[in-house]
Amino acid sequence: ELPPSLKLYQEIQHHYQALYPDLKFSTAKNHASVLSYWDKIGTPSNKHRWCCAVMKTAPIYRLFKIEGNKQAKVLTFDGVRAEESTRRSNYGRIGKGVKHDTVINARPILNWSTIEIFLYLWRHNLHINVAYRQGMTRVGCLICPFGNEWNEMIAQKKYEEPLSPFLTKVEQFAKKGGIKDIKNYVGEGGWKRRASGDLV
């Protein structure tokens, strides 16, 4: 995740625990780093999109098991919006068993525009991720095969240090794979188009 997203989570947790002291927050994390999975599986790509399942969904289900509810029925409110992508424009406001049988996805802001989102946030004085104020159009992972050039440029300028290990890993894979123009491969997102089981 982007550093300001993690910071925002902490701020929101602190804010709501001050208001509701009995409110419990649980954090689901994978037992290994995302880069260790890159070593095993290769970079995620627009064809091999393993990252969300491995780094987000699986840890949530593991957390349910740890907390004693192996077959928890889950209602997830997510913030996806139709204007974000062609795929998302085909989503319904309610998705039953879309990725997992026991999960219902509710998408209350699916048909909202970006302007409507920010007007709502400002009107209700809600926390806003700093990355939006820095110019990002979508806030998600620090590096993503579905990321756009604009967000990548901002991430490289604002989050050079946390981004560096990922770009170094992409360069290493490119070198191992015999890519001639590594700078171009990394800069133009060649790693995002990986379609085979190979690392590049």
Show where each model-derived region lies.
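ATP-dependent adenylation/nucleotidyltransferase module used to activate substrates
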Residues: E1-R123
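ATP/NTP-dependent adenylation/nucleotidyl-transfer catalytic domains that generate, transfer
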Residues: E116, W122-V200
